[in-house]
């Protein structure tokens, strides 16, 4: 079998050149042997992913990074919701506004303090600062985390506190400029199948 690394996002001309070099210029079957990314995506993406969807996802990731939300996206991956399929990951890139990301808030205690200080969640503490030493910030942060199903990462706190307003359903939703190939079957592999590795 012949294989080649492909960096995504890519374009139609590049992927056609790859197909020619690995023997798929007249159609055939492929599978993806590996993924390389600064994000923990390799466990979430499979060997039979659609190349047009991968390209669309990679373009969306570029937009997420350009908006300064790559750290937030990475934290949302750790949260573990909406990561089961490539379709879910595409929807995740389109709905970063549904998440609140608090960089630097990495413990229940620091989250409890944030809620009290920044959000004024416990007005009585502002009115009577003398009782603050007796307040259990850690327990408050822990209970709030449980109630809102948030999670701590090594870099901060992430919670989904909004609804998805954009939804990707199928290939028909991919803008034409991100389509790089007519579908080449990624199923029913044979010994003559070609292999590709993706860099996202």
Residue ranges and their predicted role:
Residues 1-13, 194-200:
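Short, extreme N-terminal segment that most often corresponds to the first beta-strand
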Residues 136, 184-200:
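Non-Sec secretion/translocation targeting segments of pathogen effectors
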Residues 83-120:
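Extracytoplasmic/secretory-pathway segments with low complexity and glycosylation-like composition
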Residues 111-113, 117-185:
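Mixed-charge, low-complexity intrinsically disordered segments
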Residues 13-86:
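Structured domain cores in non-transmembrane regions
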Residues 1, 38-42, 165-168:
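Short, surface-exposed beta-strand/loop "edge" segments at domain boundaries and coil↔beta transitions
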Residues 2-7, 29-34, 149-160:
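Ordered hydrophobic segments in well-structured contexts
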Residues 5-8, 44, 169-170:
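Short amphipathic beta-strand/extended segments with alternating polar/hydrophobic composition
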């Amino acid at each position: 079998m012949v294989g080649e690394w492909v960096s995504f996002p890519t374009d139609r001309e590049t992927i056609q050149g790859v197909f020619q070099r690995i023997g798929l210029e007249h159609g055939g079957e492929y599978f993806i042997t590996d993924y390389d990314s600064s994000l923990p995506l390799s466990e979430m993406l499979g060997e039979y992913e659609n190349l047009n969807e991968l390209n669309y996802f990679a373009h969306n990731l570029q937009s997420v990074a350009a908006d300064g939300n790559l750290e937030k996206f990475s934290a949302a991956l750790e949260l573990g919701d909406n990561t089961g399929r490539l379709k879910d990951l595409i929807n995740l890139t389109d709905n970063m506004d549904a998440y609140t990301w608090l960089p630097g808030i990495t413990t229940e205690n620091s989250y409890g303090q944030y809620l009290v200080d920044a959000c004024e969640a416990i007005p009585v503490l502002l009115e009577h600062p003398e009782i603050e030493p007796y307040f259990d910030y850690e327990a408050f942060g822990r209970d709030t985390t449980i109630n809102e199903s948030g999670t701590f990462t090594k870099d901060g706190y992430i919670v989904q506190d909004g609804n998805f307003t954009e939804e990707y359903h199928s290939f028909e939703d991919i803008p034409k400029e991100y389509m790089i190939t007519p579908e080449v079957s990624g199923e029913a592999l044979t010994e003559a199948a070609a292999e590709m590795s993706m860099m996202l």
